[in-house]
Every structure is written in structure tokens, then in C-alpha cells.
A protein has these predicted regions:
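Catalytic toxin/effector domains delivered as secreted proteins or via bacterial secretion systems
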Residues: 2-124
Length: 124
């Protein structure tokens, strides 16, 4: 019997690789009702390196009250086509405006600042 050759994986992904970022995470907290619907609606592609760095700095996004989530979901349904075409920063800003929970907004502000700084770095 011969030994199989193991495939070698890249330890660091190429800078052009994209990963799906759930703006509202972790899934175990955002797994039911309007929370799950909002989590699944707000997924945007981001570079893998940025995605890993963000998750190493911010471990979870707190789940707001169910009434706030329901109100935000109803607003999302009215403007779904427009919101789905938004980039990651615009989508985070939309969530920040429509869900007025203090802890949630703190996490959204952190993500917004993080992505804004990363996009500034790539422009130059």
C-alpha cells in the first residue's frame, strides 16, 4: 500500500479572497425568530483577512429586545431590494439607525469604525 500524498493548504488566504460576514453574530444567539431573519438578511462579502481580524476583536453582537427586532424586520421588508444592494458599511449603518438598543449600537459602531478604517487603508 502506498501512502496518500496530503494536499497542502494555504495557511493565509490570498488578499483577494472573500468571506461571508454575518453582521449580526454569533449564530447561537441569533438563531430564532426575527433575530434569525435579520441575521440571514445581513450577510455581506468581506476579505477573509479582515473577517478574521474583526472576529478576533469582537466576539459577539448582543441580541436586542424582540420588539425592536420585529420593528426593524418590518422596515427591512419595505426596503429589502435597496438594502440587499448596500455594501457592508451601509448595511451596518442601516442596522444602527433602525435598532436603538445601546449594546447593539455599540457593537455596530465598532464594526463600522473597523470597516471604515480598513477601506481607508486600501484606497491609498
Amino acid at each position: 500500500m502506498s501512502k496518500k500524498k496530503r494536499r497542502r493548504c494555504r495557511r493565509t488566504p490570498p488578499l483577494t479572497a472573500k468571506d461571508r460576514h454575518h453582521i449580526c453574530y454569533q449564530g447561537r444567539y441569533w438563531g430564532s425568530g426575527y433575530a434569525k431573519a435579520i441575521r440571514n438578511a445581513f450577510v455581506r462579502p468581506v476579505p477573509v483577512v479582515w473577517h478574521r481580524e474583526l472576529h478576533s476583536r469582537l466576539s459577539t453582537v448582543p441580541v436586542p429586545d424582540g420588539a425592536l427586532l420585529k420593528k426593524a424586520w418590518v422596515e427591512y421588508q419595505k426596503e429589502a431590494d435597496i438594502i440587499d444592494s448596500m455594501g457592508v458599511c451601509q448595511a451596518i449603518a442601516w442596522l444602527y439607525v433602525h435598532i436603538p438598543d445601546v449594546e447593539f449600537r455599540r457593537a455596530m459602531q465598532f464594526q463600522l469604525d473597523f470597516f471604515a478604517s480598513k477601506f481607508e487603508e486600501t484606497v491609498y
